[in-house]
């Protein structure tokens, strides 16, 4: 579950991480009030107006602006709230901005130069360990750094039996080129950040940039946080941070009816039982020269109602040009699934305007094929995996 920057900073602050202070605002009037409050509490004269959406690259898209007075705070808040913000990480149409974070300006002059770093904590699925990834190249897309200057990215693997050790936090601060008070502050920052990651059951905490201020303080200027969905049952206060408006509406609907659905960019809709078979089906579609439009696991109870619901969800994606149903009948009987497909087709009528290819293998597969072939519906049936792929290719060629 992704959360907003301001929510991520709330979690960080609760674990002792120093963050750029800010107040969330839903309109220009609230933004001005927030700026006045920040000035009274911090003395800051300038403010940063930051769009709050679940995507990075907001600055490049015009979603982060500097306001030098209250009039600019009001003007920029009016400009950003309600806009369709397009970044490299949003859909082509962008995302609507519903709120902004009015933050203090932390790039003030002082005894030393400011420096920006990149620090993230995430799970390394290859090693099964948590990992801290960091770089001196803060404020940039880490993907660009990895592509052009990979030697500037460092990693620190964390042994799960002992957790983050002091020498590891010190090594990170050393590799970032810090010394004196800034070195000590970074060690504290890394320790608190890791504790926040573990304590919140997160799968990622990305801070970009981490700022060394001109008076040698270390603070989080941004926060991109993902909480593990499987742990939300024991993190109720973080579960309340969910913003459904930021999520794909089709995925939200599928989740509400118990379907495991992930929206993708292709043209071939998939309806499969079992995650492993679903991934294999997606591979087969790609080998056939096409792209899957979704990942959809209907689970072990693929009855008529569930199949019809899955059909309706898949067809909400206007990019779908064909649907491939691939079911292995173990616990589920193939003839029941086939009847569900036929019934769903009858119930939905003209709503289904794309070719449907059905491959059923396992319990009562022969009966299922007869049901489909004798239904009178324009449904193509296949026996072999490759045969199904060939039928998809023929339907879309």
Swiss-Prot record:
Domain ATP-grasp as annotated: residue spans: 9-253
Reactions performed catalytically: succinate + ATP + CoA = succinyl-CoA + ADP + phosphate; GTP + succinate + CoA = succinyl-CoA + GDP + phosphate
Cofactor or coenzyme needed: Mg(2+)
InterPro entries membership: ATP-grasp_succ-CoA_synth-type (IPR013650), ATP_grasp_subdomain_1 (IPR013815), SUCC_ACL_C (IPR005811), Succ_CoA_ligase-like_bsu (IPR005809), Succinyl-CoA_synth-like (IPR016102)
Residues that bind substrate: 273, 330-332
EC number(s) reported in the record: 6.2.1.5
Any Gene Ontology biological process: succinyl-CoA metabolic process
GO function terms (MF aspect): ATP binding; magnesium ion binding; succinate-CoA ligase (ADP-forming) activity; succinate-CoA ligase (GDP-forming) activity
Record's subunit section: Heterotetramer of two alpha and two beta subunits.
Family to which this protein belongs: Belongs to the succinate/malate CoA ligase beta subunit family.
Protein name: Succinate--CoA ligase [ADP-forming] subunit beta
Phylogenetic classification of the source organism: Bacteria, Pseudomonadati, Bacteroidota, Flavobacteriia, Flavobacteriales
